[in-house]
Amino acid sequence: MKRFALVLMLSLVLQSQAENRTYSPQVKTLQAVVNKDWLSPTVMRLYGNDFLNITFDELSHDSHRYIYRLEHCEADWTGSEDIFEADWLEGFNDNVIEKFEHSINTVVPYTHYQLQIPNDRCRLKLSGNYRLYIIDDDTNETVASVEFMVTEQTMLLSMAATTNTDIDVNGSHQQVSFKLSYGDCQVTDVSEQIQTIVMQNGREDTWRWNTRPSSVNHKGLAFEHRRDLIFDGGNEYRKFEVLDTSHPTMGIERIRWDGAAWQAYPFLSEPRPVYIYDEDANGSFYIRNSDNRDNDITSDYVWVNYRLKAPRLHEGVVVIEGRWATEEPETYQMNYDETSGLYTASILQKQGYYSYQYLWVTDDGVSHPLPSEGSYYETENRYQAMVYYKGTGERTWHLTSYAQITLR
């Protein structure tokens, strides 16, 4: 029963942290990027020139026939039941992923798949939330899913962030405020027609839903001095690059061949009692290798062995978090080794640059900065805000505004 509760807790937290999920152990390195901007959340403009590129690997050279299926979702990510597919999709659903290539000269053989939205078979007609399912056509099993957003930017949203918060000044927190102008959208009942979300570094486990506005008028809303828009500053993400299997690269202490696979060891993660600035990517990742040619099919898979020096926590678990963490939740849980006094985890990852952090997930399923990592007001964080709108008589929620700011 205790193990079941632990798995459920991890599942709830880690699934909320990643918009992208893989459900097959053979599917790896799922990534969704808008306009080659691998540092930002997956948000596209409606009827603009934006494109969403989705890639993943299947660990074999046996080509599978995969199809992708799109679903429009409400503001809370439940499927939209009150509109028809023809309302939001121009073209066809359930299309085959036609672009794939086999890996070249890699120890771990894999097939790399790629698709782009929009394309000549489908185009989106409504703003809002979308979920894309990748399905094995032979078994009809869903092997992965990707969540992304489409915004129409019909409302004006302005954001600000400060370290002078309502609970401390230049302490361990940061606070967000924002203002919303309705533009030409008709709003007669704010509680029924407007939904808002604010989050830190694109992490859904930091979502702040429907904060109460500090002021309301016929032109818009203001959200200032709201305590639920106070966030832990946390610490800068850690990082490493595995660019070459013949020698260590940035952040890697050593790399070796064990007779069956490559084993890479990032430097031991020591406690961070004071803040030290280090430019990071807030959990993002980028696939490449030292040759930097055909990275998607020439980069190999290596086992990355994480080691964290921290006092043992007697409640909850320690997990590794990043936008690349799309597999089963237990994959990213660290185990405490009594002999070495370290938390450890080994994860199979593709060569490239990785940004990550350690989180403490308490027994109530809430994630916190790990105590040994610290939480500092100086930490560079990105904040995102989304505003959803439902007009009078409309049957679904539209994403009418999206904004992102960086607090340095």
Question: Language-model segments: what does each one mean?
Answer:
Residues 88-113, 204-211, 305-351, 363-391:
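Aromatic-rich carbohydrate-binding modules that target alpha-glucans
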Residues 25-72, 169-180, 293-306:
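Contiguous beta-strand segments within globular domains
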Residues 1-20:
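Bacterial Sec-dependent N-terminal signal peptides
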Residues 75-77, 122, 136-143, 203, ...:
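Short acidic/polar inter-strand loop motif in beta-rich domains
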Residues 107-137:
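Ligand-binding face of N-terminal immunoglobulin V-set domains in extracellular IgSF glycoproteins
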Residues 18-47, 153-167, 279-293:
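Short, compositionally biased P/S/T/A/G/V-rich stretches that sit at domain boundaries
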Residues 150-173, 376-401:
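Low-complexity, Pro/Ser/Thr- and charge-rich linker/hinge segments at domain boundaries
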Residues 264-314, 399-408:
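Basic K/R-rich, polyanion-interacting modules in nucleoproteins and related proteins
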